[in-house]
A protein has these predicted regions:
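Membrane-interfacial helix-loop segments of redox and metal-homeostasis proteins
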Residues: 1-189
Length: 189
């Protein structure tokens, strides 16, 4: 589960304890020396990992629908059983695969956070951060539905769980940046 490593690293960076993790690197990478820079970096890493794992689940669903096996097992951990389930692998409204929805969402989140990190004092940054927080908060309802599906199947998809963790980390990061943007801490160096 290579996707889990950058997801956890990103989550640690957006949390307050991330300050102690980046201290050795802050001289070489000056943007990590500030709270805002560290959270932005953690969010970028998280969104890249979330997009990558979502693209992977989309690929797996394509392979499974063609009759291939990717990660099937006889244990509770079987992403083929979860992702390959034709009834649960698509959203109930539009019929789009969850992996595609996740990939598109994480790419949009990546745009929101990356553009905001490059122009942190632009007028539109507040809107971008609030949209990111809203999108990731909405993701909690999607996660609840997908976990319900996994409980119904009595299987756990490792890739899906990694994407869920990435959403939680992204919400924490966007929420912290929104709060920071509303305070004087936004422009502290």
């Amino acid at each position: 589960m290579l996707y889990l490593i950058p997801t956890i690293v990103g989550m640690l960076l957006v949390l307050p304890l991330g300050r102690s993790i980046v201290t050795p690197f802050s001289e070489k990478y000056t943007s990590l020396a500030t709270e805002r820079g560290r959270i932005f970096f953690g969010l970028i890493v998280t969104c890249i990992a979330g997009a990558a794992v979502s693209f992977q689940t989309l690929w797996i669903s394509s392979k499974v629908s063609e009759g291939g096996n990717f990660c099937s097992s006889n244990t509770v951990f079987s992403c083929d059983d979860v992702i390959g389930n034709a009834e649960y692998n698509v959203d109930p409204i539009l019929g789009l695969p969850w992996g595609g929805i996740g990939a598109a969402t994480f790419c949009i989140l990546l745009y929101l956070v990356y553009s905001s990190s490059k122009e942190p004092n632009a007028d539109w940054v507040t809107l971008h951060l609030k949209l990111g927080a809203l999108a990731t908060f909405t993701g909690f309802f999607v996660i609840a539905l997908l976990v319900y599906y996994e409980i119904q199947m009595e299987k756990i998809c490792q890739y899906c769980t990694t994407a869920h963790i990435a959403n939680v980390a992204a919400f924490i990061g966007f929420f912290r940046l929104v709060r920071m943007n509303d305070s004087n801490a936004w422009n502290e160096s």
